[in-house]
UniProtKB/Swiss-Prot annotation:
InterPro entries: GCS_T, GCS_T_bac, GCST_C, GCV_T_N, GcvT/YgfZ/DmdA, GcvT/YgfZ_C, TrmE/GcvT_dom1. Belongs to the GcvT family. This is Aminomethyltransferase. GO terms for biological process: glycine decarboxylation via glycine cleavage system. It comes from Nitrosococcus oceani (strain ATCC 19707 / BCRC 17464 / JCM 30415 / NCIMB 11848 / C-107). It holds the Pfam family GCV_T_C. The glycine cleavage system catalyzes the degradation of glycine. The lineage of its organism: Bacteria, Pseudomonadati, Pseudomonadota, Gammaproteobacteria, Chromatiales. The gene is gcvT.
Length: 371
């Protein structure tokens, strides 16, 4: 039996199909993954993401510590409640994890990272924190609920205490606000607007019930994956890992090169890769024939072979889509090897869908039958 979140009993009583995810028993879906996906694109869905790792970093030298630890620059965060997305790299420039870091106070930051990387992330942070005398504290007692979709903000606003409502309503993307017992961030992993709520485990079931009573549809990991894939968002362990750099994984935008004297871990390798010319790039793939793209499938492009890093069926576009790593400069039509067949596909720039709207060229959307 795996670990259980504070909301687990509600998942089980709702008849969720439970699966193991990084040692946690988590809902894959509650009956229809496609219906859950569409609820987020068209209305509002809720996700239990309490398996995510939450870490508090405190100390006089916490900012210099994060200058070294992260590829992005926390000096962009000057006001408490602001946040940024970053990769944390090893000495070879590989991605240990991708994460969100929030400025909580002048000498305090909060990091939210992936569940599957918990042990190595904590070990890496702790091994580098000592010289800076930074206090590292995990917060496993906190639960986390993602409320996503075009109706998500209104749904949350209706449940907030008056003391917090105006602050939350005025949040911009990648901003957060909080009071005792409730942290609200305007972030997400679906390509839709919404919030992620951090709260004590004792409050989690009450919030879940109230959000559901207000019309939010419970959603599982299956819909979470198809939503993030449509949004062109990377999945750790598939689209990037410790053997790939941000530059070849579509994450070059998360690397802060300035100031040049900020010597973050992995910087020298990234600079050398950039100077030599990064050999790979990330692209989106839109299948033009029957089949389903999956991780590991070979792609034949105009400049050589590539590989699908994550793929699946897009409920919004009604065809298979994927993220892929291909030779730099490759473009145009390509072929994907699916069960021994070469199936035509088109290379496109992600995202595929954002805010409920298709982002791919209309001429590539001729109806096809997907098996």
């Amino acid at each position: 039996m795996g670990k259980h979140t504070a909301i687990f009993d509600l998942h089980r009583s709702a008849g969720a199909r439970l699966v193991d995810f990084a040692g946690w028993d988590m809902p894959l879906h509650y009956g229809s993954q496609v219906a859950e996906h569409q609820a987020v694109r068209q209305g509002v869905g809720i996700f239990d993401v309490s398996h995510m790792t939450v870490i508090e970093l405190k100390g006089e030298k916490v900012r210099p510590f994060l200058h070294q630890l992260l590829a992005n620059n926390v000096d962009r965060l000057t006001v408490p409640g602001t946040a940024l997305y970053s990769c944390m790299l090893n000495t070879e420039g590989g991605v240990i994890d991708d994460l969100i870091v929030y400025l909580m106070a002048e000498q305090e930051f909060r990091v939210v990272s992936n569940a599957g990387t918990r042990d190595k992330v904590l070990a890496w942070i702790e091994s580098h924190a000592a010289p800076f005398k930074v206090q590292v504290e995990e917060r496993p007692e906190l639960a986390m609920i993602a409320v996503q979709g075009p109706e998500a903000r209104a749904q949350v606003h209706g449940q907030l205490p008056e003391s917090l409502k105006e602050k939350v309503v005025n949040l911009k993307r990648f901003q957060a606000t909080w009071e005792e017992g409730l942290f609200v961030a305007r972030t997400g992993y679906t390509g839709e607007d919404g919030y992620e709520l951090l709260l004590s485990g004792s409050q989690a079931q009450d919030w879940w019930r109230r959000l559901q009573a207000g019309g939010a549809k419970p959603c599982g990991l299956g819909a979470r994956d198809t939503l993030r894939l449509e949004a062109g968002m990377c999945l750790y362990g598939a689209d990037m890992d410790e053997t790939t750099t941000p530059l070849e994984s579509g994450l070059g935008w998360t690397v802060a090169w300035k100031p040049p004297e900020r010597d973050f871990i992995g910087r020298a390798v990234l600079e050398a890769q950039q100077a030599a010319g990064c050999p790979h790039q990330q692209v989106g793939l839109l299948l033009q024939g029957k089949g389903l793209m999956r991780n590991g499938q070979t792609i034949t492009t105009n400049l050589g072979e590539g590989v699908v890093t994550s793929g699946g069926f897009s409920p919004s576009l009604e065809r298979s889509i994927a993220l892929a790593r291909v030779p730099v400069g490759a473009d145009g039509p390509c072929e994907v090897q699916i069960r021994g067949r070469a199936v035509p596909a088109a290379m496109v720039k992600p995202p595929f869908v954002r805010n409920g709207r298709a982002c791919v060229p209309a001429e590539l959307m001729e109806p096809i039958e997907v098996s």
